[in-house]
Amino acid sequence: MSKILVFGHQNPDSDAIGSSVAFAYLAKEAWGLDTEAVALGTPNEETAYVLDYFGVQAPRVVESAKAEGVETVILTDHNEFQQSISDIKDVTVYGVVDHHRVANFETANPLYMRLEPVGSASSIVYRMFKENGVSVPKELAGLLLSGLISDTLLLKSPTTHASDIPVAKELAEIAGVNLEEYGLEMLKAGTNLSSKTAAELIDIDAKTFELNGEAVRVAQVNTVDINDILARQEEIEVAIQEAIVTEGYSDFVLMITDIVNSNSEILALGSNMAKVEAAFEFTLENNHAFLAGAVSRKKQVVPQLTESYNA
């Protein structure tokens, strides 16, 4: 078989990078596939910290599979086409490893799919290593652990599955790190946003969802102090309005997540704010509102928005 590109979603986070790099290695070792892990964007601060810590080179960034002369791809940490490579509809999807909802996804041919409602795609990839009798190199264990820590906020998010806890402990042992100490330092590395422009900030970890025919952009930034982000509200709103006009979003929802106290502030702009308010049963004041206990876009924001937009 010819070369296969393996990649996570656009605006890649630690799980997208870690799961794709590790799965590309597994596919070579277990099944002899000619795989290369690539990325659909540059690593964010958190992921850059992870790659540097474990001495792993960042995957090269690609925009088109066809431009690489590649006809076949494997997706990790996503399946929705609008979150994937630009020419996803023009290539063959060989396989998917994901832990999200399945939506806006269709293929012409059968494929391999591994979908589990767990805390991270990295958790699934690690189990696949074990199932296939392939040892996980120390640096890849570090990347997989980081993906799990990132997506579950160090196992505190409601997306954390019971099986993620032993996975985290095993990966920490292989990687040679203290789970709690490393995890906290890693998460803190991702909260240093002072050098980011407002446009960069709202695009660090952002995904587009099609909700009842509306293109809704849901972004998330992690911080140790929500007020640090709200202090930049004016410039952030300008950037959001520009994104809405340029990209054609109907609405833009920004989660500002306090990783210390496990709460979020929702900053939202667009044409369906009544639906956003109904989703979370709050009232936006000056375009934002507090959402107690919310840390997960996947479990505590997108499903609620989906229900409200479909009502």
UniProtKB/Swiss-Prot annotation:
The keyword Cytoplasm applies. One of its GO terms (cellular component) is cytoplasm. The lineage of its organism: Bacteria, Bacillati, Bacillota, Bacilli, Lactobacillales. Mn(2+) 1 binds at residues 9, 13, 77. Pfam families: DHH, DHHA2. Its main location: cytoplasm. One of its GO terms (molecular function) is inorganic diphosphate phosphatase activity. Keywords: Cytoplasm, Hydrolase, Manganese, Metal-binding. The keyword Cytoplasm applies. InterPro entries: DDH_dom, DHH_sf, DHHA2, DHHA2_dom_sf, Mn-dep_inorganic_PyrPase, Oligoribo/pAp-PDE_c-di-AMP_PDE. Mn(2+) 2 binds at residues 15, 77, 99, 151. Its cofactor is Mn(2+). Its EC number is 3.6.1.1. It catalyses: diphosphate + H2O = 2 phosphate + H(+). This is Probable manganese-dependent inorganic pyrophosphatase. Belongs to the PPase class C family. SUPFAM superfamilies: DHH phosphoesterases. It is found in: Cytoplasm.
